[in-house]
């Protein structure tokens, strides 16, 4: 593995860790309606479990409501059941093939729990970043041991790996701070 490939590989892994964090945070409920809340909902359809997005269209007509337009009328009760089982704290209101999900306001206690959870996700991501850094540094040690790179170059590349880790760590901090503000906004 050459130096450029190593750096690119580390950057891709760190970017992937950041994307995972982003995906986890989208699942955290804020006061605003978001179709991402329903990503975890599966529906018993045609003899198998399917994601909700494959049996209905999802929209947010306003900041406090999610609309689920079920395509097949026979699936409405199955979709309602899937939403209830997902335990998201949402109560479906059905009107024909349209299911409305009013988003209740979050209590202060629940907001605090969500902020703690967001911080936990952030810390888990930082642990992933540090593991990626460690793996990169081990590759550098091996390259130096095999006389592929000199000691000075090893030191320089280690500093670059550390800078990359610091950059991504600060990105994690800003993403978490932004999510915290989103959750705490009433």
Swiss-Prot record:
One of its GO terms (cellular component) is cytosol. Gene3D superfamilies: 3.30.1360.40, Ribosome-recycling factor. The keyword Transmembrane helix does not apply. It comes from the Bacteria. The keyword Protein biosynthesis applies. Signal peptide: none annotated. GO terms for molecular function: ribosomal large subunit binding. Coiled coil: none annotated. It is found in: Cytoplasm. Pfam families: RRF. InterPro entries: Ribosome_recyc_fac, Ribosome_recyc_fac_dom, RRF_sf. Belongs to the RRF family. Responsible for the release of ribosomes from messenger RNA at the termination of protein biosynthesis. May increase the efficiency of translation by recycling ribosomes from one round of translation to another. This is Ribosome-recycling factor. It comes from Rickettsia rickettsii (strain Sheila Smith).
